[in-house]
Amino acid sequence: MKNGGSMQVQMKLGVMMRDLLQVEDEAWGLYAFSRDILNRRILPETKTEMIAKANACGKAYAQRIIREYGTRDVRVIADKLKLKLEFQSALMTGKRVLFACYTPPYTIEIMEEPVRRAAELVQEEEQALVELFQQAGIMNTILGHEIFHFVEDQFAHEIYTRTEKILLWNLLGFKNYSTIRTLSEVGAMAFTQELNRLSYPPFILDVLLYYSYDAASAEKIYRDVLGVSSGRCREPVEDY
């Protein structure tokens, strides 16, 4: 009974991963926007432009780091940047599992248990997926993502993901602007994809890493992403 149930779960994961591998970068960015508190305050065409710029930003800064340090190895880069890496088993925040965290100025925490569990799940899938999602590769992808957030801090005055802002309110000549969290995430994904020479969008790890903890939530992410990708999910834009 346990073996049969396990096989059913594994097959389901494989189907989701294969579908998600076909999703374009723009759709992943729109999915990320759909979870952003500022989502409805930005026009659809503006989001598309922002996503493209954030992707270009992430890739450009990855190439800059590669040129400066002469390597794509994220562990070596982290060492050269004087980052302190801490590896934990797992960390819960409310009902959610935290996979990694950058704490300024120099600390990156990565949770090893979710990565191990994800890699073990993939082992039961077809060889093409096994090769894409090795444990070491997943770990390097996550590390690259967090390194980008450090890079953002270092170049906050010029990096697109920090300089692009949205006007929150304008009262009696006083204006309040906010950065857009989604752009930081899109940039980080593009950065680690470029550093690690990934053939897949790193956003897909949101599904893979969650799956061993909460398959229902992972499936919801999967369906939401496909909904955005197909154009079925449209949200109104607020007037402000």
Segments from the language model and where they lie:
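Conserved binding/catalytic microenvironments
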Residues: T103-A119, Q134, A156-I159, K165-I166, ...
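Metalloprotease/metallohydrolase-associated module, dominated by Zn2+-dependent proteases
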Residues: T163-Y240
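Long, positively charged binding patches that form subdomain-scale interaction surfaces
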Residues: E126-I142
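Residue-level recognition of short, structured coil/turn motifs
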Residues: G70, A156-Y160, R197
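Active-site recognition of the HExxH zinc-binding catalytic motif
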Residues: T141-E158
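A metal-dependent hydrolase signature that marks the N-terminal structural subdomain at the beginning
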Residues: M1-L121, Q127-A128, L132
